[in-house]
Amino acid sequence: MHFRKKYEEKLALSSLRKRINRMALTDQKLRYARAQADSKEERQRVSHEIHVADSLNRVEVKAILRQYGWPGISDIGKDGQNNFWLLAQHADDDPEFQQAALAAMQKLKKTGEINLDNYAFLYDRVQYNLNYRQWYGTQVNWTAHGKANGFRPIADEAGVDRSRIACIQGVIDVLNFAAR
């Protein structure tokens, strides 16, 4: 308990972190419930609940993005930043918003304030939602039961590992600078 309080005191926006983490917890509980559903009807019911939750979360995430830009790790912690990304990632009904979120995230790409894996995932999600091929190979097709079933189209399958390495180069540069 003491450690968590000390950690939260170091964050610039700890109350925002809590708000984001609550939304993400609901998001994940619903998706888990859908994956565990025993019938088509139950999956459809939970899918509707997910759609409603995603819509409400998107309104909140848009407001946060307008007020703060993309909150970094020093603002809301690694968990908060990962969960903020998750909520943007699940805003598939609004690819224009996802593009705006990606642009805000892009500004922090070389600062160490974001998880670059999340950047790659959101980049590919935006590409897919705009009917383009993904670059980093992060997006997969899903079965009705929530099982991964092969990659969605990749722009350069032979070079996808190079793309992934290039994405994390910013982290390597930051670490090398910090080590000096």
Give each language-model segment a name.
Residues G112, N118, L130-Y132, V140-F151:
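Alpha-helical protein-protein interaction modules
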Residues M1-Q81, H90-D92, K109-E113, L122:
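Preference for long, solvent-exposed alpha-helical segments and helix-linker "stalks"
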Residues G137, N141-R180:
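A cross-kingdom marker for long, charged
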Residues D93-F97:
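Short coil/turn connectors between adjacent alpha-helices in alpha-solenoid helical repeat scaffolds
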Residues I76-N83, L122-Q134, T143:
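Charge-rich, acidic-biased intrinsically disordered regions
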Residues M1, Y119-N129, I154, A179-R180:
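Alpha-helical solenoid repeat scaffolds
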Residues I64-L65, Q98-Q106:
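Alpha-helical repeat scaffolds
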